[in-house]
């Protein structure tokens, strides 16, 4: 595999991640906002449960990390833009996970008041992660357009 092909594949995986998170932060956010508290709670618990077991989600969300390991082993850190994009993607994922895991736990045990707060925090967390992932894609795109 050539270095360019490896970079294209890593870029594509970052773009798919960003697209998935933009969908969650925009379309799914509106769907969740249309739900009452009990529907929201049931939906989020079900979504998290099925996402953790989905081969598609596990694959799509982990390909950039798994692909970066052999890329950096073979090609080192020559492409600093790709490195910056992957680093931002990793930071966004870690931030998103730490923010949202607490929210998911609060949703599971939450009353109506806490669910409203959890919904706002979840919306904000998804939006922040989607924006950061989109910026990661832009960073990784720079070498292809120069």
For each feature predicted by the language model, list its residue ranges.
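Short amphipathic, positively biased membrane-proximal segments
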Residues: 1, 31-34, 127-134, 139-140
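Interfacial loop at the N-terminal end of multi-pass membrane proteins
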Residues: 3-62, 108-120
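Hydrophobic residues within membrane-embedded alpha-helical segments of Major Facilitator Superfamily
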Residues: 9, 13-16, 88, 95-96, ...
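Core segments of transmembrane alpha-helices
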Residues: 57-70, 129-138
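Juxtamembrane helix-break-helix junctions at the cytosolic face
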Residues: 68-80
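Short alpha-helical packing/oligomerization segments
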Residues: 77-102
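Interfacial loop-to-transmembrane junctions
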Residues: 102-132
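Juxtamembrane boundary at the C-terminal end of a transmembrane helix
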Residues: 140-146
């Amino acid at each position: 595999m050539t270095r360019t092909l490896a970079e294209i594949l890593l870029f594509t995986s970052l773009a798919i991640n960003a697209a998935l998170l933009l969908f969650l932060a925009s379309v799914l956010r509106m769907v969740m906002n249309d739900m009452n508290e009990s529907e929201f709670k049931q939906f989020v618990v079900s979504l998290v449960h099925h996402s953790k077991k989905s081969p598609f989600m596990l694959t799509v969300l982990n390909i950039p990390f798994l692909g970066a390991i052999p890329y950096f082993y073979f090609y080192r850190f020559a492409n600093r833009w790709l490195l910056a994009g992957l680093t931002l993607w990793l930071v966004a994922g870690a931030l998103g996970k730490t923010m949202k895991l607490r929210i998911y736990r609060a949703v599971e045990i939450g009353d109506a008041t806490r669910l409203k707060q959890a919904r706002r925090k979840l919306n904000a967390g998804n939006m922040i992660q989607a924006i950061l992932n989109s910026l990661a894609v832009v960073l990784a795109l720079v070498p292809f357009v120069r």
